């Protein structure tokens, strides 16, 4: 989990409170309970302050990120670049989809760049290189999402002709949603092996998405994936989102996805 952005839910603090006091004699009075009451009250008070500080820190981090994201957004607008933020769980097929996508966009003459977020390594970036697009890996290490500052650092290196920037965020359906990168839109991916209930379990992502890509449709039948339930759950959370069904393996739905990207570029 992220150790710096505050998106980790737990507080890793060890409080050692020796409650068993050996006074050498037994008190037949109620003051021991009074002591416990005061002790508990003090600790409740401490935890309240700790929670307030934690929330304040989280908000400060988000506010700082939002300011940089707005600068990124202005940078994109000034150069006519459409930036899209792809968010999903690990293994949903983001990189496989981008492989097919870059091939199609290169054939169509669309100048494209890709920024790939992963904790470590450059495996995904290596898969995407040589497909007619500028590709750069961003290693986030112990973090669980890309930040606007990390994106800003990479922008000067983008080719001047770039019209579309595809950002493959870290595999996580929670934390990346809160961190605006300056993108024009968030794109959520839901693969058939993940099940139909993910929009209900992770509503923030699907509510924020301009489009939902239902991926790995070639596996739907063998997995017993209930397509109608999945679509109903997506619509329940976000009635306005575009929903595209596709398979990177068979190419099903790929043309509609490329058409969607071209429309976003021209908006």
Give the ranges of each region predicted by the language model:
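Canonical P-loop GTPase G-domain recognition
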Residues: 220-267
């Amino acid at each position: 989990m992220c150790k710096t952005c505050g998106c980790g839910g737990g507080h890793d603090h060890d409080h050692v409170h020796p409650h068993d006091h050996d006074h050498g004699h037994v008190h037949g009075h109620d003051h021991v309970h009074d002591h416990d009451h005061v002790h508990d009250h003090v600790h409740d008070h401490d935890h309240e302050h700790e929670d307030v500080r934690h929330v304040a820190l989280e908000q400060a981090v988000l506010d700082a990120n939002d300011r940089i994201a707005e600068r990124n957004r202005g940078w994109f607008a000034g150069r006519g670049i459409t930036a899209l933020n792809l968010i999903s769980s690990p293994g949903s097929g983001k990189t496989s989809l981008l492989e097919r996508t870059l091939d199609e966009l290169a054939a169509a003459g669309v100048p494209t760049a890709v920024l790939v977020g992963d904790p470590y390594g450059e495996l995904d970036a290596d898969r995407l290189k040589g497909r007619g697009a500028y590709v750069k890996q961003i290693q986030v290490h112990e973090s669980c999402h890309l930040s606007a500052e990390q994106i800003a650092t990479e922008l000067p290196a983008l080719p001047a002709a770039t019209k579309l920037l595809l950002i493959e965020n870290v595999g996580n359906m929670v934390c990346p949603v809160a961190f605006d990168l300056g993108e024009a839109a968030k794109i959520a991916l839901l693969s058939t092996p993940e099940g139909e209930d993910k929009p209900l379990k992770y509503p923030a992502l699907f509510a924020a998405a301009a489009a939902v890509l239902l991926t790995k449709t070639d596996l739907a039948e063998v997995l017993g994936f209930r397509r109608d339930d999945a679509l109903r759950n997506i619509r329940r959370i976000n009635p306005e989102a575009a929903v595209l069904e596709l398979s990177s393996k068979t190419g099903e739905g790929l043309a509609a996805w490329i058409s969607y990207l071209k429309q976003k570029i021209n908006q």
